[in-house]
Amino acid sequence: MAMLLLAAALWYLFGYPAPPVDLQWRAPAATQIPDDAVTVRFAGTSTMLFSDGETQWMTDGWFTRPRLSQIALGQVAPDPAAIEFGLKRLDAQRLAAVIPLHSHYDHAMDAPLVAERTGALLIGAEATANIGRGLGLAEERMRVVEHGESVQLGAFRVTFLESRHLEYADPDMVDKLITQSEIPAPLVPPASIYDYKLGKAWVLHVAHPKGDFLVIGSAGFVPGLLDGYDVDTLFLGVGALGSQTAEYRADYWQETVGAAHPERVILIHWDSLLAPLNGRLQGEMRIAGLLSGGNERLHEWLRARRAANPQLVFQTLPRFEPSLLFP
């Protein structure tokens, strides 16, 4: 009996609960795409491919899903097969850029290999460049940017705004991944997830003739940062937001959605960091959720935000399929 109970407990802890979003929020996949439309494809977490038919570029480019055992042993590394699979499913051809939203492993670990395979420029903080150097990416294939700097990618103008990362509930993680923010030398994998320091947490403001949008990868904020950046669509990172206080969540909403006045909010970074890339989008593994906390609180809060803002189009994205951002 004891063995059965142990097996049941392990099955539960290492299983995936329902995600903290409602299925009916999912945007439809585009069946017909006008030649000049701007589209987005979502691979999971905050990896997205944007295209206007002329130019493709990507946030994060993270496709590897390290196992818990690899994370525990400090042995995470890019998985070339997963990267090839993800790029193929996204129909990523020749990318203008891959832009990690910060330098943690679940954003930047694969980005240099994505750049190498697609011809993209790797753009980000110095920490991101040191991830690229550790994987042998040539210096001319990387660009280090600072707060307020803009990069032109075809008709897309991307402006980098330095924000803050959400603070984890675990003080040790805060110290190792946020307070110690720099990667001071080329990072050669396999490595610990704690070696993938924050670097800088970017919010991207993207201007295009068809419409403007913001991409917020981490549920952190700087008061007043987004004042004056009104946009049509806001991609809102909500990872681990349920672990924060109700006051923090209210402030986060006000400093993002409240500041930018979007017509549409698209949720990102709500799915599991461990579930297979070739499966459906899942909630975080229960044992990982116990560490980050708040999956149910996040779901309740998102439902409440949607109900309180009926004028907003409130969406998630299908996996890998194109969705119309601006027809």
Task: Tell me what each language-model feature is.
Residues 129, 133-150, 254-327:
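Binuclear metal-ion centers of metallo-dependent hydrolases, dominated by the metallo-beta-lactamase
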Residues 1-30:
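N-terminal membrane-anchoring alpha-helices
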Residues 185-258:
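Active-site-proximal loop/helix segments of hydrolase catalytic cores
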Residues 59-62, 94-104, 123-126, 214-219, ...:
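Active-site neighborhood of phospho(di)ester-bond hydrolases with catalytic His/Asp-centered motifs
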Residues 66, 104-109, 129-131, 149-151, ...:
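Active-site environment of divalent metal-dependent phosphoester hydrolases
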Residues 55-99, 104, 109-113, 168, ...:
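Pre-active-site segment of Zn-dependent metallo-hydrolases
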Residues 33-86, 197-217:
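Conserved beta-strand hairpin/beta-sheet module of binuclear metal-dependent hydrolase folds
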Residues 143-211, 288, 299-327:
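Flexible, acidic/histidine-containing loops and adjacent segments that form or flank the divalent-metal
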